[in-house]
């Protein structure tokens, strides 16, 4: 069944996109939540009128994502974790840990958008973490994991 999306739907698409979905998915999930409408000549005409507004919102999102990318890549993330003498962490650094640290730095990033190489980081060192911002815009953020005891002695 062909539909037109009223709002951005994760995995499926963005507002104004024409998609082919199962009739049951449309009938039971998308339509009751007003996320999509059936594709017919009336809805197509309505979306042609709104197309300029939709494109303007998308361009603003792209611009905001590009600005956020520049700010994220310019500022390295430093995480202090307890580690043994061999540099192996007692815990692990996950996407949740990185998202929390970014929130402390003033960046609002969802945990789901943070991609940690190998899902977890378990050793002290320098890494690069990818953050998916919008469409194809991704920020590669340098992350430094330090031993917490060394970080405490440096701050004193």
Swiss-Prot record:
GO terms for molecular function: rRNA binding; structural constituent of ribosome. Gene3D superfamilies: Ribosomal protein L9, C-terminal domain, Ribosomal protein L9, N-terminal domain. Keywords: Ribonucleoprotein, Ribosomal protein, RNA-binding, rRNA-binding. One of its GO terms (biological process) is translation. SUPFAM superfamilies: L9 N-domain-like, Ribosomal protein L9 C-domain. Signal peptide: none annotated. Binds to the 23S rRNA. This is Large ribosomal subunit protein bL9. It comes from Treponema pallidum (strain Nichols).
């Amino acid at each position: 069944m062909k539909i037109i999306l009223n709002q951005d739907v994760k995995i499926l698409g963005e507002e104004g996109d024409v998609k082919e979905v199962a009739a049951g998915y449309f009938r039971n999930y998308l339509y009751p939540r007003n996320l999509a409408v059936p594709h017919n000549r009336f809805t197509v005409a309505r979306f042609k009128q709104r197309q300029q507004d939709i494109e303007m919102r998308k361009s603003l999102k792209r611009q905001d994502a590009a600005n956020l990318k520049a700010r994220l890549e310019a500022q390295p993330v430093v995480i202090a974790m307890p580690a043994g003498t061999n540099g192996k962490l007692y815990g692990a650094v996950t996407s949740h840990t990185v998202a929390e640290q970014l929130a402390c730095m003033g960046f609002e990033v969802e945990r789901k958008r943070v991609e940690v190489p190998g899902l977890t980081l378990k050793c002290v060192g320098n890494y690069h973490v990818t953050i998916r911002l919008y469409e194809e815009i991704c920020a590669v953020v340098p992350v430094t994991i330090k031993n917490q005891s060394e970080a405490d002695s440096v701050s004193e």
